[in-house]
Amino acid sequence: CNTAIECIDKLRDTMQSHERCSVVEVMGRRAGHLALQVGCAVGATAICLPERQLDFDTEIVERMRIGRIKGRNHHIIIVAEGYGSAQDVADQIHEATGIDTRVTILGHIQRGGSPSAMDRVMATRMGYAAVRALMEGKTNRVVVSDNNIVTDIDIEEGLAQSKDLNQCLFEAQQTVAI
């Protein structure tokens, strides 16, 4: 997440000075959690997630129009790779608004970068929980963090779980983005 945010912060400088729209594709083939986190952190105008289809005219074009009225001279649209083609989104934006729109696909660069302090602390906590489970004789377990509580669960239970999109965060981003 941090690497994507750093890249987008650098893109923002160019977008502002040239009054452009930047469509940025981030990882998320089957889930939009990363795209949502990144979009919130960078103040994206819109976030395209595989979990939900957008009404293009109201959730992108209209938001861009309102942003222009309020003085925003650039836009960042985050697209999770599972949503669809970032280039198609950019082409639709340019066609609907006439705004110069560029695509950046972050790809595997997102896998690199230094861990944050939170990442390092979480790794310590999860590593400790894994060793503790082994010392207790537990097998076929996976260490998880649920609401910042680290524990171990049966691996089959872990594999069967899915993580729902954070609707509250999505709604907050939709509200404050313009």
Roles of regions detected by a PLM:
Residues 92-99, 109-124, 134-135:
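Catalytic, metal-anchored helix/loop core of enzyme active sites in primary metabolism
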Residues 86-88, 111-114, 149-154:
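Short active-site-adjacent structural elements
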Residues 29, 33, 108, 114, ...:
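Gly/Ser/Thr-rich helix-start
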Residues 141-178:
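Phosphate-binding loop/pocket of nucleotide- and phosphate-handling active sites
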Residues 118-144, 148-151:
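Glycine-rich phosphate/adenylate-binding loop
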Residues 28, 53, 108-110, 148-149:
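Acidic, glycine-rich active-site loops and adjacent beta-strand->loop/helix elements
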Residues 1-100, 104:
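Accessory alpha-helical/coil subdomains and C-terminal extensions
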